[in-house]
Amino acid sequence: MTTVLLPRSLLALFPGVDRRHEVAPGTVGSVIAELDASVPGIRDRLVQAGPRLRPHINVFVDGEPADLATQCAEASVVHVIPAVSGGA
């Protein structure tokens, strides 16, 4: 199974949802679709029309930058990382 790790900032929008999820391997797009089946509404937070990842969302598969077409292997780890902004 492919492991998906969600950021705490996203978990705050979905109370009770675990940070770690195991899903079937496939493209990042299919991984997000499967994740949305168990966490309804999460796809809308990650993907915009096109479809493509929202500008403030970064996805890494096995440490490499990814988009919706990136393939995830059986043992892949997918990190969803929101952009961080702010100033001093």
Describe each region flagged by the PLM:
Residues 1-88:
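Ubiquitin-like/PB1-type beta-grasp interaction modules and other compact soluble beta-rich domains
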